[in-house]
């Protein structure tokens, strides 16, 4: 019976490890969404404070930037997703970005709920594993006591 208990305990341990990995991946996803939200907030702030004639740094990639003068703030090019972009007025651009931020809020909330469920499941499995270990220890103690009693 002890062999079967060890096997069940090992299976629980593997399930716990898989749950922990899944939780970690979801938490990374949440962090990515929060970073994306921060980028959106920065973009909205830049749109609201930018004026024609302002000098900005334009990223070229690889950590390289070039300074450029903003010539026209009337139309802002906004990514719509799926490699599509569109020119938008300042107000419309802020609206599009706000909706993206709201969608990220929803995704974060859904993902956090999933994390919470998995953490709850993980706690239940940990409790089961602890109970199994205690039972196995008690059985070992009883067997030791019996064998000592048999020797006397």
Curated annotation (Swiss-Prot):
One of its GO terms (molecular function) is unfolded protein binding. Residues 111-124 have a biased composition (Acidic residues). Keywords: Chaperone, Cytoplasm. GO terms for cellular component: cytoplasm; prefoldin complex. NCBIfam families: prefoldin subunit alpha. Heterohexamer of two alpha and four beta subunits. This is Prefoldin subunit alpha. It comes from Halorubrum lacusprofundi (strain ATCC 49239 / DSM 5036 / JCM 8891 / ACAM 34). The gene is pfdA.
């Amino acid at each position: 019976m002890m062999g079967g208990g060890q096997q069940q305990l090992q299976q629980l341990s593997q399930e716990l490890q898989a749950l922990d990995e899944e939780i970690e991946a979801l938490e990374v996803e949440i962090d990515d969404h929060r970073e994306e939200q921060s980028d959106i907030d920065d973009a909205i702030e830049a749109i609201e404070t930018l004026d024609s004639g302002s000098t900005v740094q334009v990223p070229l990639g690889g950590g390289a930037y070039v300074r450029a003068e903003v010539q026209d703030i009337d139309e802002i090019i906004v990514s719509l997703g799926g490699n599509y972009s569109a020119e938008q007025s300042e107000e419309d651009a802020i609206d599009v970005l706000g909706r993206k931020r709201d969608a990220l809020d929803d995704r974060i909330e859904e993902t956090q709920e999933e994390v919470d469920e998995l953490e709850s499941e993980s706690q239940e499995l940990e409790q089961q594993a602890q109970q199994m270990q205690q039972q196995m220890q008690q059985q070992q103690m009883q067997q030791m006591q019996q064998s000592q009693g048999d020797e006397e």
